């Protein structure tokens, strides 16, 4: 055989794992639409098949946010609602009574989200647009303060509640 010849044979190329992917946090750090498209094209090339888009988040660290401020609990809540930064990266028309918009300035339009879903399907990528609640729901609470939990979370800290666990019904 010459230097440019190959023997007859068979090449089988397939991934070793059924789930091959990752999560992108676009809630805290906006990733432009064109970059997401490029990422998905690269994922397909490397046979990756799962992409979770984290579309909302809070960028607050309460201790640092309230450091040096002598505020009552009510004043702390008001300060956080007025000053803490949030991200909600999907276009929506929702506006609170206070004039606060749910959608961040940097966001994906409805058309862009539909295009990402179509592209993912064509590339055999399982795209999961994820809205993280209740833990990262400050963007919702700024628009709809009535959705805010009013009880004390410290009542549950470190305690096991059989009724809450049973409610999950993991069977």
Describe every region a protein language model picked out.
Residues 1-170:
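Feature activates predominantly on carbohydrate-active enzymes
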């Amino acid at each position: 055989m010459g230097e440019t010849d190959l023997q007859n044979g068979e090449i089988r190329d397939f991934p070793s794992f059924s789930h091959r992917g990752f999560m992108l946090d676009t809630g805290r750090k906006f990733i432009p639409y064109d970059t997401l498209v490029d990422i998905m094209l690269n994922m397909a090339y490397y046979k990756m098949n799962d992409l979770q888009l984290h579309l909302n988040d809070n960028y607050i660290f309460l201790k640092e946010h309230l450091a040096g401020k002598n505020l009552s609990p009510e004043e702390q809540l008001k300060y956080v609602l007025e000053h803490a930064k949030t991200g909600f990266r999907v276009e929506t028309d929702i506006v609170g009574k206070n004039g606060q918009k749910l959608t961040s300035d940097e966001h994906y339009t409805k058309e862009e989200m539909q295009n990402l879903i179509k592209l993912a399907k064509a590339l055999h990528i399982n795209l999961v647009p994820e809205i993280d609640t209740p833990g990262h729901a400050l963007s919702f609470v700024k628009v709809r303060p009535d959705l805010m939990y009013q009880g004390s979370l410290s009542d549950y800290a470190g305690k096991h509640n059989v009724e809450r666990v049973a409610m999950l019904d993991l069977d």
